[in-house]
């Protein structure tokens, strides 16, 4: 599911064979002038975009991350194949995922425009931010965490390593916070929710290992929070 494109340079080549979005014109005004549509009887322009779904604001489904070749609820990773996800696809919850959204503007709470890369947001940070906003995290909430990184990159116009590089984000310990608060989903304005570099070199994206296949939480990346931050 793509909620909104925020830049054409936000996807990098990686082991999953992702590529930057490709925009192709299928029909143009010059085609019309050249007489290409004379027999058709209608002059028009048309185009298409091809892109990996991780190149824009997206939900990470429960079939996105595997641990020991298993996904959420113990389903085999083999159930995600060239035909798509037979289990835990995001489309399975499209009619069920509705709830209260809670914006935790951690950057504003900390008194900064944005967090620098590598800054880990801890359980205490989330709790103190919620307290300062006079909001209580409840079971089933959709928690949105703002680091300010998206706006910083939009202002600078330099995406660099935004997709796949170092970033501020949630500390590994927040997996326990997510579990204890029984929230439904967590969203951030960074590319992968958790802090980069990771807090350990023993695992790649360890927060993902726990939150998605073990706790069963969907996550959202690349969330554009400029407007909700202004109207809060």
How would you label these PLM feature ranges?
Residues 8-9, 13-54, 67:
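A long-range scaffold signal marking pre-active-site subdomains of enzyme folds
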Residues 4, 55-57, 143, 186, ...:
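Short conserved micro-motifs on helix faces and helix-strand junctions that flank
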Residues 9, 48, 100-103, 141-142, ...:
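Structural motif
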Residues 1-7, 12, 224, 229-231:
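Single conserved hydrophobic/aromatic residue that forms the stacking wall/gate
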Residues 53-142, 150-152, 165-167, 175:
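Glycine-enriched loop-and-adjacent helix/strand subsegments that border the catalytic/binding cleft
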Residues 1, 50-52, 97, 181:
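Alpha-helical hydrophobic/aromatic positions enriched in membrane-embedded helices and signal peptides
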Residues 145, 149-225:
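Feature captures the catalytic cores and cofactor-binding loops of soluble hydro-lyases/lyases
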């Amino acid at each position: 599911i793509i909620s909104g494109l925020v830049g054409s340079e936000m996807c990098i080549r990686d082991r999953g064979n992702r590529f930057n979005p490709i925009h192709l014109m299928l029909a143009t005004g010059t085609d019309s002038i050249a007489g290409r549509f004379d027999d058709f009887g209608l002059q028009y322009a048309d185009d298409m975009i091809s892109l990996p779904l991780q190149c824009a604001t997206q939900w990470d489904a429960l079939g996105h991350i595997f641990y020991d070749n298993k996904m959420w609820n113990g389903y085999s990773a083999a159930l995600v194949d060239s035909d798509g996800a037979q289990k835990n696809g995001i489309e399975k919850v499209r009619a069920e995922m509705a709830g209260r959204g809670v914006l935790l503007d951690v950057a504003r709470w900390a008194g900064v425009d944005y967090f620098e890369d590598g800054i880990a947001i801890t359980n205490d940070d989330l709790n103190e931010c919620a307290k300062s906003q006079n909001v209580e995290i409840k079971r089933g909430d959709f928690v949105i965490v703002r680091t300010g990184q998206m706006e910083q990159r939009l202002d600078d116009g330099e995406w660099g390593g935004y997709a796949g590089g170092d970033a501020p984000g949630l500390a590994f310990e927040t997996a326990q916070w997510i579990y204890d608060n029984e929230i439904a989903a967590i969203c951030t304005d960074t590319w992968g929710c958790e802090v980069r570099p990771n807090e350990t070199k023993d695992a790649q994206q360890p927060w993902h290992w726990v939150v998605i296949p073990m706790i069963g939480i969907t996550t959202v990346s690349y969330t554009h929070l400029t407007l909700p931050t202004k109207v809060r």
